[in-house]
Swiss-Prot record:
UniProt xrefs under SUPFAM superfamilies: Prokaryotic ribosomal protein L17
Organism: Streptomyces griseus subsp. griseus (strain JCM 4626 / CBS 651.72 / NBRC 13350 / KCC S-0626 / ISP 5235)
Subunit structure: Part of the 50S ribosomal subunit. Contacts protein L32.
Keywords noted in UniProt: Ribonucleoprotein, Ribosomal protein
Gene3D superfamilies: Ribosomal protein L17
Region feature Disordered, mapped onto this chain: 127-175
Protein name in UniProt: Large ribosomal subunit protein bL17
Protein family membership: Belongs to the bacterial ribosomal protein bL17 family.
């Protein structure tokens, strides 16, 4: 029978740790973000990421595997229908941990663990438009820098080209 990694358990036995992580994952998927201790957030992250990855696959086998961890069917339904499609094109990194200081009563280090919002199509389009604008500004700046140098060269060329153009016109008139 597999057991959790050696070392300190979160709150006691291995069974208690398993249930604690399942409840934390359930709350995370229900609310999108939860505040907990840093140790619990660090232990929750791989569990939650694994569940989202299974939900992205979307088949009945993976749904049953997720139901072994999270027993609330409504949360599992939300995970499979709303949360997993958001991360369709994201290979991992579905959660973010932000440290928020120490708890007032026992000075325990606290953190917020939240689901990272996937880029929407509108956000991607906005980002692409901003990048295109920046490129256009850079190109205009380069053209302006090159323009004074090019004008001085162009001013010299028409004077040299003018006699050749006149000679060509004369040849055309003679024919």
């Amino acid at each position: 029978m597999p057991r959790p990694a050696k070392g300190a358990r979160l709150g006691g036995s291995a069974a208690h740790e398993k249930l604690l992580l399942a409840n934390l994952a359930k709350s995370l998927f229900e609310h999108g973000r939860i505040t907990t201790t840093e140790a619990k957030a660090r232990r929750l992250r791989p569990v939650a990421e694994r569940l989202v990855t299974k939900a992205k696959k979307g088949d009945i086998h993976n749904r049953r595997l997720v139901l072994q961890t999270i027993t609330d069917k409504s949360v599992v339904h939300t995970l499979f229908t709303e949360i997993a499609p958001r991360y369709e094109n994201r290979p991992g990194g579905y959660t973010r941990i932000t440290k928020i200081g120490n708890r007032r009563g026992d000075n325990a280090p606290m953190a917020v663990i939240e689901l990272v919002e996937a880029l929407t199509v509108a956000q991607q389009a906005t980002g692409e438009a901003e990048a295109a604008t920046k490129r256009a500004v850079k190109e205009d700046a380069l053209k302006k820098d090159e323009a004074p140098a090019a004008e001085s060269v162009e001013d010299a060329k028409p004077a040299e080209d003018a006699p050749a153009a006149e000679a060509a016109d004369d040849k055309g008139k003679d024919a």
